[in-house]
Amino acid sequence: MLRNEALEEYGKAQKLGQKDYREKMLHGQSPFLPVLDDILQNVQVENQLPLGLVEIPIKLVVGTKTAGRTAAFASNFMPLLDLNSEFGSKWVALCMAHVDEGIRDPIRCFEYMGRFYVQEGNKRVSVLKYFEAGSVTGNVTRVVPKYNDTPEVRLYYEFMHYYPLIQTYLLTFTKPGSYGRLQKAMGKGPEEKWTAEDRAAILSLYNWVEKAYTALGGDKLRATVGDVLLLLLRLYSMEELTKASPNELQQKIDALWDDVLALQNDDPVTVSEKPAEPAQTKLLERILPIHPAAPTHLKVAFIHERTPETSSWTSQHEFGRTQLDSVFEGKVETFAYFNAVPGRNADLLIEAAISHGADIVFTTSPKLVGASLRSAVNHPTVRILNCSMEMPYASIRTYYTRVYEAKFITGAIAGAMAGTDRIGYVADYPSFGVPANINAFALGARMVNPRARIELRWTCLPDQEDPLAVFTRKGITVVSGRDAPVPGRPQQEFGTFLIRPGGVLQDLATPFWHWGQFYENVVHSVLDGGWVRDKSGTDGRAVNYWWGMNSGVMDVLLSRELPSDVAHLARILRTGVTAGMIDPFACRITDQNGTVRNSGRHGLDVEQIVHMDYLCDAVDGTIPEYDDLTEQARPMYRMQGIHRDQLPAEKEATL
């Protein structure tokens, strides 16, 4: 490169610096490079570790170690000083050297929280950034902050754990647990090192994802390229992604854009507690329609994990499907697919339903969420809903019911009917909402008998004695059993029942899922335009329908043998809960450790109920963790367990 050419390049770089300087001043921000020494004044440092020579992504070099050179550079590392200065002459010389033979001398810098601050070699970095180089070699010293429980420090400590395995700084994330998930997605064990080939493959894919993400405006979002790459690896194999063309990669990211936006939120799920109101057509829209007309005929598909003959759960949803046929006769056509197995035929069955013309697809098991998400990405005009809770995927919607409302009422019935102060409770999985169900039942029982105690037994634990045998031996005669009949078990052994002398079971009451009402509400919302109005919205959060008794999708069936006074109490409670006049959790709640969880002056918010992970002091028993469960129960916990997000990556669910 000729000197005159290098002088011209300096002038261009200086203009970039001056532009950045003006923009930062306009927005009240510092126009200079951040200084690590200033940053560390308010940081407790654990230690400093020499890392030796490291290939540093140039975009992660963000500042200087000391304040000595800050006035020479704008915050984008472009030069600010006059061309005729000694600084300008050295920059020009480095520019010529870079173009002619490359800058070979490593810089000296400090790394703090994944960002690099230059001690020696600022001008080299400036030249390399100007020419948009990908990386720079540096002799690095790592500054380790003292551990605390902030998400940023937790994530950084996680990175430090995995850095010896992955040996790259380029992959950055915003969510704790991401490095472990990446390790799993790469097919590696928790402590298995990457090969050079592994690193080359993932960094090549990273570069293509970065280009696609940036083209879609991702550089303006909080979610990193690493976040998006990990999202893709949740849905597609490494082989599928590496074979995809740049255009195909961009199409995949574009199709997942709602899910990318959901990554922006610390809480990616918004809960809808009641059906959307019908859309009101404005006068202008009547004269000149602005939005597409609502459909007049719908095809609705149901994908079930099992059959009605082998699963009462599937039978209940099928009963709801037939309600659609009768309520929307001539407007809605429904069809069902059975025995959908994740990883085998689930994706194919959903694709078959869509090929058959399905406008709406309901998948009725949490295990089908991965297949649902992949189909939603491939068919963005098809409305796909999965029966589950707290799934952070905005491309689909999820749905379940507020069972705790019904459990509160059956708890009051149990408290009134129990001959002693002890009542049995059988729970299946420690999933989202289940501790709330148990506590609501206990609070209902305590409302009519302040001495009531709930004996909790789980069906998901290994080598457990039959709960009914335990209750009978302890003299417990009223039990809240499973919420639906189970093949091979007595028909009466669900809901809340009384154990009579001789072991005869008498129904008292049971929670009832009116799935037909839910499906009817969803179809109505599509036909009248309400579906669009209750979309996740501009914040990009996933929608979880969590409807209760006020929507008609949840109820309590009372036995005809229930004493009339107790039935009268149950109806009063049902009316109060449905009208919103009675809140099961609007009372003083103390947990098993004596901690007051609610003073009683107000109820609990939705997040507190969904994520409840404690038992109130009226309950005798514990909430099992993942490692306590049977092998058969663990897949459900991976999907819906209350501490699902705390599982190590190797134990997380595979979509």
Where are these regions (language model features)?
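An alpha-beta-alpha
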Residues: 321, 409-449, 539-559
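Segments of small-molecule ligand-sensing domains
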Residues: 529-655
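Short, well-structured alpha-helical segments in soluble
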Residues: 343-359, 463-475
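Flexible loop/hinge segments that line or gate small-molecule binding clefts
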Residues: 377-400
